[in-house]
């Protein structure tokens, strides 16, 4: 392939889409205590909305329990309310110093709901990867129209780009299968 066509930017962007999907998957409750579960929760503190991990230490002392220790004890009630109001369906217990967050078993219905959600997240990731491919294809075709690359180089670049796209979509599908298996584990 010609040196004119560099797919490293496309690969970087596809990798970013994959990492975004994996990060989203980490925030989905599976019945096991995982501090990443609280990553999406923001707390109203000091006149602004902040991620919970910025205002508290989060630990997992047991497989089914998270503990949240605020750096500022005045934020206990605010953190508790933010967790209670979130879509996680968890019931925080405030003892005046720390918040204990027991992670209950998932019901069959909730598991199916979460599987639908992770499938949607995976599809969004696939769409992101395909959008990167589309953008890169436009660039390759533009280079061909402007005469900067030959038709053979264009075909080779498109084939290489398709291989890259397929590889990243496969990785997203593998991450999805792993998360689905984790969610169905009783």
Swiss-Prot record:
InterPro entries: Ribosome_recyc_fac, Ribosome_recyc_fac_dom, RRF_sf
Stored Pfam families: RRF (PF01765)
Entry annotated with the keyword Protein biosynthesis: yes
SS bonds (residue pairs): none
Keyword annotations of the record: Cytoplasm, Protein biosynthesis
A GO term, aspect molecular function: ribosomal large subunit binding
Classification via HAMAP family: RRF
Protein name: Ribosome-recycling factor
Organism, scientific name: Rubrobacter xylanophilus (strain DSM 9941 / JCM 11954 / NBRC 16129 / PRD-1)
